Amino acid sequence: MAVKFSILVVCLNPGAKLAETVESIRKQEYRDYEIIVKDGGSKDGSTELLPADEKIRLIEKKDTGIYDAMNQAVSEAAGEYVLFLNCGDLFYDEQVLTRTAKAMEKNPGKGIYYGDTYCSKTDSLQTAPGRMTPFQCFRNIPCHQSCFYARRLFADRQYLPEYRIRADYEHFLWCVLKQKEEAVSLPFTVAA
């Protein structure tokens, strides 16, 4: 079944953070989404605490690291757009998907829609640039948990798992600079 959004949550022994992340998704007022929890073999019982919900799919499969896990999750996605909201990440409020869907209706078919990210540890807002220029790409790209990617951008090329960190940054650069995909700023905070 096709849905508008696939919210992808990757984890390995996340403890209570898994339930917190999933609950923040389930609180969204906009309902045209699926949740894919990609677990790499947790032994802490966290996946057993997932609520019974037809919108949640649990994929339990070994992976070689965070980006391999994210690639496995996106391979299972049915949504037109995907967002990686990994364990510990939360939607900023219950209107994020509603506001995002409305923004997409006003400016349809773009490769990436991105917003701001609130960091609770530092009580600060990571403000994404209003317009994504090549200069901004190397200076201030948005956090992955605040980027809605067209799923098609992962069809031919996923995250490069040889990167232990920043493969999400590299993939954003590939999409915008190499593939010339338009990245549209959302005028609100997406994730916390």
Give the role of each language-model region:
Residues 1-192:
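Nucleotide-sugar donor-binding/catalytic module of glycosyltransferases
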